[in-house]
Amino acid sequence: MRKIVTQVGSLPLEDVNEAVAYSLKHDIPFLPELPKRGDAMMEYIKKPGNLSCLKEFKKHKFETVKIQCVGPATLMLSGFKENEAIQRICEHITAITDGLEAGETILFLDEPALGQSGVNFRELHRAIFSAYKVTPGAHVCGNMDWDLLFDSGLEIISFDASQFDITKYSGYRSGKRISWGVKRKEDIKDFREGDLLTLPCGMGTPMYKREDCGTNLNKLLKIAEEISGK
């Protein structure tokens, strides 16, 4: 069974059932976040575990599932103290994983501006990931010194392949899996077994409409078929 296509998380939808049904169409279902219902990452972290789709999503069993949470460096850039950031994140992840039935759970920490944070994110991430039985990953849609991620304890690195070429860095891969955030097939420079495909970022911004969900999924599925032969 192919396990390539998933999503960053946020969707331009409001209906919970529609969002969960959409997620289930992906190779790797993901926990939908609906900013129009208050699921923006700086909002849900105020009330950890308060996500619109969580209850409906947990009705399903998964072979592999992807969940996500705002990362500690991002919260600290927004004014949170280190201990409070980690506590809120862990409360949120615990609320998500409690009762979630999955053979494998991929957890991405969303760190949009990690390159500008100036914090020791490796220690922060380790403190979080060590508390859960998950496959650890991070999503960074901005630019940074990617060697820092290649030299981290992450197993999956998610990035905007439509803007950045991480293959040119000396530490490229270092045994890591890559989640390629693409707009077109040509954005992929070095797809290997175990890698993932997503859009460059989430679809929770005003530029995306409801009809874009199906269009973008079909595009990702087509690219996955072309590069995998499945």
Positions of PLM-derived features:
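Alpha/beta catalytic barrel-like cores
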Residues: M1-A85, V134, L148-D195, T205-K230
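Conserved, mostly hydrophobic/aromatic
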Residues: I67, I89, I93, E111, ...
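Active-site-proximal loop/short-helix segments
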Residues: Q68-L77, E104-E123
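Short, amphipathic alpha-helical segments
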Residues: N83, Q87-E91, V119
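Secondary-structure boundary elements
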Residues: R88-L107, A127-G137, E226-K230
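N-terminal active-site wall of soluble small-molecule enzyme domains
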Residues: G118-F150
